């Protein structure tokens, strides 16, 4: 069979089906849209499920795709086998009421024979037990009856993807790899056929004839229209066409393995291959998942990604790597896959950053965690026990970040077993209180507690910042207790409190509970119904139910929260005035440092709109508007025109916050008494959290002052560096220097005190002017320096003699190779002409790099052309190493490409080609 690269196979596939009238649909996200039964996209047909069931109008009747997929059901065997992967790509062609069984079979065989160039006598097929129709179609196309195998529901009835959706009988294509692949049992066994577990027959394409829709309950209902769903694993097909025994030996995965060899210093062999394969596979899953916005987390998809990162880190450790490592593969992965998935180019830097941070987080505790696990196993050995308890496993999880499955894998490698059920029980206990965070936990996980009327907390925080409070209930480690002691983390329920509990987007208050000899730091405040939960750490002394404490919030933090909450209301009003009444709040976060506001709007905000919104809010802030609070019946509140959240549940009586004609909203949060208290308002970021919605991040008050102080300090540092470079190069700042003054911190403080509502707009404009000037002058300085360097390069008489001394001597001529950074092609040609004039029998192989690009210039005299040297031919072969393009004549050729780091190696390769001709 003819060798074909993975990229070539994918291209052949999409071109073929496009010619057959299929719409080529881009791969969907790894997050399945509108399908709660799936954690990840696991097959090509997932994005087409609504089309098969008739749930949506058809945009086309036939489609094809190359779909990225993640499956982790066989995670523990990845790395141990030749073909298991968690990430793979699926080729698929689909019909929605258009063609059916006959055409699907014809397409599959035609593509296999005439495009993949698989010999017909090597193809076997399987069909569902009673599918005589499929058998006839295969035989009509020349597949003999003896190479058609009937299999049951387990093998030849497919679907659905998830718990529901389209499904039906299928027919699969197999490649006969020869009796030698059957091993000692099946080698020459005439009964060995597709369906056998040996490696002789490998399935490479599954044709599903969708006739049914399976409901969530498992019932099979006839589809409104029949359909075709085919799937062919891209890596599997490449393995067969490249005639290797493992998907990890195919061209793309082999490139990743080679990069791991370079980074680790280890060779890929029998002793290291499991580690190499795990890292190769998991890095792909993580790379594509992060690219689709699936970030490491404690639950759901994020937990799976975190588990893959940590599993790969453990296997990297077996190669002697004890530092963040996976993120270093991102560049290689980007180069490999950005042709099929161009969106990854722009995401690569973010992926690299997130991955590095996650690796650092895990490696920080890994060493200690492994030592702790070793202690546990040694203890079990002494006690002659074989089971690691769920409690121990959970301790490794909560303290050292070991995913349950990773601990299980580690202990089973050592011959122990793991108590899964016990781990689950410990996890349930921890749902409320965890070592890492108090935030967002639910009251029902506190043993022996219910939010009863007797535990109602009276909230005083709208008017008070401190109060005398009686302790109604205590919790430590999730359990109800009557007293606590120093050093314990606890949850305290009080009869009355000034602490605001998280709600309406505003985060909970922090502060202290004190009495003589006792101090409790409140790190967060949550609530369940009318019960307020003060969560934190006992810093000093003991506390018992019934004790009276002084409750006091952090007043400055509360003021900052009020600034940002009132600022959020003004922002909402400004958005509706400037963008239109279609703007609806979709969510918000109000913290002491910033606010985040999600709202409905179909497109990104322009620069002018952002300035308008910012100005509108700052005008309201400067207008000194009193903030009015009313408690109204809900009907009355709605009639007053107050805005409310559509999906929020309200009681019969609601609190309404008004700021003149600028804002009127339902709200239970804490606010300023006058808009002037907000100080200043600045938008720092605008983006999209999802289709049809926009997100603004903004800051208020002192945060705005600190923001601009930092912005201008950073800008001043950049300008200082630029001016220093200009002066060092040209002796003065006349042409390239930036002389406009950057406001000092003292001047900025004065501006904030004097300029009021206009200060943010003025500072934004000034910053932009300085940034534009810096960019323009930096570009001009760079070009001038480059021009000077090239002039010096051209005028250097010692360069020619130095290169001639370094030349490689061969029987029929000499060759000089050199890489010059930041030199233009014309200068290289001039240099080559000088060398040729001084030494007629010399071949010049020059390269230069600039940023992410590279250029090659090859030149010689005609005397070497007569001896077999053709610069154009040598260049063409060499540019493959740089993903480049170019060409030329026998005596002169020029080309460019990427991969500047590979230029030196490419010249070595060119030298080896020249050596053959000149020896």
Curated annotation (Swiss-Prot):
* Residues that hold Zn(2+) according to the record: 565, 569, 667, 671
The record, for PROSITE patterns, names:
AA_TRNA_LIGASE_II_ALA
**Cofactor comment:** Binds 1 zinc ion per subunit.
Indicate whether Cell wall biogenesis/degradation appears among the record's keywords: no
The alphabetized UniProt keywords are:
Aminoacyl-tRNA synthetase, ATP-binding, Cytoplasm, Ligase, Metal-binding, Nucleotide-binding, Protein biosynthesis, RNA-binding, tRNA-binding, Zinc
Its main subcellular localisation, reduced to a broad class, is cytoplasm
Keyword Protein biosynthesis found: yes
Please give one Pfam family short name: tRNA-synt_2c
Using the UniProt record, name the top-level EC class of this enzyme in a single word: ligase
* UniProt GO MF annotations: alanine-tRNA ligase activity; aminoacyl-tRNA deacylase activity; ATP binding; tRNA binding; zinc ion binding
Catalytic function, reaction form: tRNA(Ala) + L-alanine + ATP = L-alanyl-tRNA(Ala) + AMP + diphosphate
GO biological process annotation, one example: alanyl-tRNA aminoacylation
Q: Which SUPFAM superfamilies match?
A: Class II aaRS and biotin synthetases, Putative anticodon-binding domain of alanyl-tRNA synthetase (AlaRS), ThrRS/AlaRS common domain, Translation proteins
What is its cofactor? Zn(2+)
- One GO cellular component from the entry? cytosol
Write down the EC number.
Answer: 6.1.1.7
Q: What HAMAP family does the record point to?
A: Ala_tRNA_synth_B (MF_00036_B)
What UniProt notes about the protein's domains is: Consists of three domains; the N-terminal catalytic domain, the editing domain and the C-terminal C-Ala domain. The editing domain removes incorrectly charged amino acids, while the C-Ala domain, along with tRNA(Ala), serves as a bridge to cooperatively bring together the editing and aminoacylation centers thus stimulating deacylation of misacylated tRNAs.
NCBIfam families, per database record = alaS
Q: Which family does it belong to?
A: Belongs to the class-II aminoacyl-tRNA synthetase family.
Matches recorded under PANTHER family: ALANINE--TRNA LIGASE, CYTOPLASMIC (PTHR11777:SF9), ALANYL-TRNA SYNTHETASE (PTHR11777)
What exactly does this protein do? Answer: Catalyzes the attachment of alanine to tRNA(Ala) in a two-step reaction: alanine is first activated by ATP to form Ala-AMP and then transferred to the acceptor end of tRNA(Ala). Also edits incorrectly charged Ser-tRNA(Ala) and Gly-tRNA(Ala) via its editing domain.
User: What protein name does the entry list?
Assistant: Alanine--tRNA ligase
Report which gene this protein is encoded by.
alaS
């Amino acid at each position: 069979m003819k060798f074909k690269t993975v990229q070539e196979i994918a291209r052949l596939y999409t071109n073929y089906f496009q010619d057959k009238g299929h719409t080529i649909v881009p791969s969907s996200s790894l997050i399945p849209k509108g399908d709660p039964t799936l954690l990840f996209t696991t097959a090509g047909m997932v994005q087409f499920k609504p089309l098969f069931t008739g749930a949506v109008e058809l945009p086309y009747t036939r489609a094809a795709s190359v779909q990225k997929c993640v499956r982790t059901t066989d995670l523990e065997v990845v790395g141990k086998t030749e073909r298991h992967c968690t990430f793979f790509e699926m080729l698929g062609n689909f019909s929605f009421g258009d063609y059916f069984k006959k055409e699907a079979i014809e397409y599959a065989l035609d593509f296999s024979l005439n495009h993949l160039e698989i010999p017909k006598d090597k193809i076997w097929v399987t069909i569902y037990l009673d599918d005589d129709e499929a058998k006839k179609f295969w035989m009509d196309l020349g597949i003999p009856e003896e190479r058609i195998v009937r299999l049951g529901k387990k093998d030849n009835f497919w679907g659905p993807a998830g718990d529901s959706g389209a499904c039906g009988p299928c027919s699969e294509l197999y490649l006969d790899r020869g009796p030698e692949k059957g091993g000692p049992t099946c080698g020459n066994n005439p009964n060995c056929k597709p369906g056998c577990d040996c490696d002789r027959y490998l399935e490479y394409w599954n044709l599903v004839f969708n006739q049914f829709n399976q409901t969530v309950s498992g019932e099979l209902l006839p589809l409104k229209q029949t359909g075709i769903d085919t799937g062919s694993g891209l890596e599997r097909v490449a393995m067969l066409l490249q005639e290797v025994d493992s998907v990890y030996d195919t061209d793309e995965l082999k490139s990743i393995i080679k990069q791991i060899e370079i980074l680790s210093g280890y060779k890929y062999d029998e002793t290291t291959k499991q580690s190499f394969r795990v890292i190769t596979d998991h890095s792909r899953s993580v790379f594509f998942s992060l690219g689709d916005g699936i970030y490491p987390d404690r639950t759901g998809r994020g937990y799976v990604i975190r588990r893959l990162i940590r599993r790969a880190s453990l296997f990297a450790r077996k190669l002697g790597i004890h530092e963040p490592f996976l993120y270093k593969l991102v560049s290689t992965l980007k180069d490999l896959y950005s042709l099929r998935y161009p969106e990854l180019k722009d995401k690569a830097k973010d992926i690299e950053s997130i991955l590095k941070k996650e690796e650092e987080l895990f490696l920080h505790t890994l060493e200690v965690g492994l030592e702790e696990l070793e202690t546990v196993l040694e203890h079990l050995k002494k006690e002659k026990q074989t089971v690691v308890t769920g409690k121990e496993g959970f301790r490794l999880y909560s303290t050292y970040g070991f995913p349950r499955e990773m601990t299980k894998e580690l202990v089973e490698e050592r011959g122990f077993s793991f108590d899964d059920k016990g781990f689950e029980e410990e996890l349930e206990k921890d749902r409320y209180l965890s070592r890492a965070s108090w935030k967002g936990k639910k009251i029902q996980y506190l043993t022996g507690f219910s939010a009863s009327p007797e535990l109602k907390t009276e909230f005083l925080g709208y008017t008070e910042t401190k109060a005398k409070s009686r302790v109604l209930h205590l919790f430590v480690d999730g359990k109800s207790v009557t007293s606590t002691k120093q050093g314990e983390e606890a949850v305290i329920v009080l009869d009355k409190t000034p602490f605001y509990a998280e709600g309406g987007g505003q985060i909970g208050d922090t502060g202290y509970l004190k009495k003589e000899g006792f101090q409790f730091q409140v790190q967060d405040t949550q609530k369940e119904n009318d019960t307020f939960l003060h969560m934190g750490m006992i810093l000093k002394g003991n506390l018992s139910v019934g004790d009276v404490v002084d409750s006091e919030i952090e007043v400055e933090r509360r003021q900052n929260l009020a600034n940002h909450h009132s600022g959020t209301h003004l922002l909402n009003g400004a958005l509706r005035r400037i963008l239109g009444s279609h703007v609806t709040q979709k969510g918000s976060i109000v913290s002491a440092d910033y606010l985040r506001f999600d709202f409905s709007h179909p497109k990104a905000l322009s620069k002018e709109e952002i300035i308008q919104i910012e100005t509108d809010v700052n005008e309201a802030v400067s207008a000194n508007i009193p903030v009015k609070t009313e408690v109204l019946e809900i009907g009355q509140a709605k009639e007053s025109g107050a805005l409310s959240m559509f999906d929020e549940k309200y009681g019969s009586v609601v609190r309404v916050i008004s700021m003149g004609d600028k804002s009127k909203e339902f709200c239970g949060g804490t606010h300023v008494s006058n808009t002037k208290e907000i100080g200043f308002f600045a938008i720092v970021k605008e983006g999209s959290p999802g289709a049809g919605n926009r997100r603004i991040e903004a800051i208020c008050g002192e945060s705005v002052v600190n923001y601009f102080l930092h912005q201008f300090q950073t800008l001043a540092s950049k300008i200082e560096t630029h001016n220093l470079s200009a002066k060092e190069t040209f002796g003065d700042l006349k042409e390239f220097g930036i002389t406009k003054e950057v406001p000092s911190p003292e001047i900025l403080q004065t501006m904030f005190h004097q300029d009021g509502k206009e200060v943010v707009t003025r500072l934004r404009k000034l910053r932009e002017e300085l940034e534009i000037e810096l960019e323009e002058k930096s570009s001009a300085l760079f070009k001038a320096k480059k021009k000077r360097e090239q002039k010096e390069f051209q005028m250097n008489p010692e360069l020619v003699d130095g290169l001639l001394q370094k030349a490689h001597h061969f029987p029929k001529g000499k060759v000089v190779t050199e890489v010059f950074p930041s030199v233009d092609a014309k200068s290289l040609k001039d240099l080559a002409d000088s060398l040729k004039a001084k030494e007629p029998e010399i071949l010049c192989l020059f390269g230069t790099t600039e940023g992410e690009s590279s250029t090659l210039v090859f030149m010689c005299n005609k005397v070497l052309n007569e001896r077999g040297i053709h610069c154009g031919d040598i260049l063409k072969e060499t540019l493959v190493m740089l993903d480049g393009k170019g060409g030329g004549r026998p005596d002169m050729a020029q080309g460019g490409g990427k991969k500047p780091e590979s230029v030196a190696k490419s010249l070595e390769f060119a030298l080896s080609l020249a050596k053959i001709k000149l020896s």
